[in-house]
Amino acid sequence: QAIVSKARRPYIL
């Protein structure tokens, strides 16, 4: 599941 933080940094949980 790809999530994008408020800093626009994509990371996978």
Curated annotation (Swiss-Prot):
Keyword RNA-binding appears in the UniProt entry: no
Gene Ontology BP, a term: blood vessel diameter maintenance
Highest taxon of the lineage: Eukaryota
Keywords: Pyrrolidone carboxylic acid, Secreted, Vasoactive
Any single GO CC term annotated in Swiss-Prot or TrEMBL for this entry: extracellular region
Subcellular location per the Swiss-Prot or TrEMBL entry: Secreted
Modified residues (Pyrrolidone carboxylic acid): Q1
Principal localisation: secreted
Chain's role: Smooth muscle-contracting peptide. Peptide action is not affected by tetrodotoxin, but is slightly mediated through the release of acetylcholine.
Family: Belongs to the neurotensin family.
Name of this chain's protein: Neurotensin
UniProt source species: Rhinella marina (Cane toad)
Lineage of source species: Eukaryota, Metazoa, Chordata, Craniata, Vertebrata
